Amino acid sequence: MFANLIAEKLQKLQLSVATAESVTGGLLAHCLTSIDGASNYFNGGVIAYNNQVKINLLNVQSSTIANHGAVSSFCAREMAVGVKQKFQADVGIACSGIAGSKAVENKAIGLLFFCIIIGNKAYDFEFEMNQNNRKDNIELFTNKILESFHYLLTKLA
């Protein structure tokens, strides 16, 4: 539902978007590109599951990961900046979190950090879901990101 509304708003506002996903594993990009005409607004995406990919491809600082962890608002923000620049998009969206069966970096299962950068304005989000099912968490995370992105676009229109 949100993907259709987002597609309409992006085209109306003539904005392009790029995604950098870790925890959602490409589902966010899939949702955004499942709409006819996606090439009018979707520049590209990266699934940066590995920390070295975050560092080498998205220019996340190794010190950010060392000091705050890959699952952090700091890492999500740097991923969003990196993907926005790499794909020359108006909007960069990035997410990192823990969907699976065990806590990582002393952070709970169901924890999501994401950042949406529109133009020069960054919006940082943190959510915690109460699901212990990996697939459910990934879907919930993706829906939360799409819902938040739609809300921000609505404020622009």
UniProtKB/Swiss-Prot annotation:
InterPro entries in the record: CinA-like_C, CinA_C
Family statement: Belongs to the CinA family.
Superkingdom of the organism of origin: Bacteria
Organism: Mycoplasma genitalium (strain ATCC 33530 / DSM 19775 / NCTC 10195 / G37)
Coiled coil: none
Protein name: Protein MG115
